[in-house]
Amino acid sequence: MEKVNLAEKFGAFTEHWRPKIVGELNGQEVKLVKFQGTFPWHHHDSEDELFLVWRGRMRVEFCDRVVELTEGEFLVVPRGLEHRTAADEEAEVLLFEPTATRNTGSAAESHFTAPEGVRI
């Protein structure tokens, strides 16, 4: 059991859309990811996702609305709900989701699909 310094961990990588695992609890992974640009539309059949903004601003877009998130705010996206994430400038985001959740969910494999299990 070791404490995690989020600023140090976010400083350890530069790529966007590539979640890094920094902790696990009760079948869930705590991941750090940097967003910039727009991610593809997708959904997760079996997993809810929690997006918590550490630094910057991001939005979660749904078919019928857009939710803007700023530092210290989070949103839980229920399983099965079509969505995409976006950030005009770089945002640092914590994700809480079940182990082995594919970041692109139902979307076809693409350059956005991150390798699973990458830890920092």
Positions of predicted regions on the chain:
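A cytosolic small-molecule/anion-sensing beta-strand core signal
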Residues: 26, 54-55, 70-71, 89
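Structural motif
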Residues: 29, 38, 57-59, 66, ...
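Short, conserved beta-strand element in jelly-roll/cupin
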Residues: 34-35, 44-62
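Ligand-binding loop in jelly-roll beta-barrel domains
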Residues: 79-109
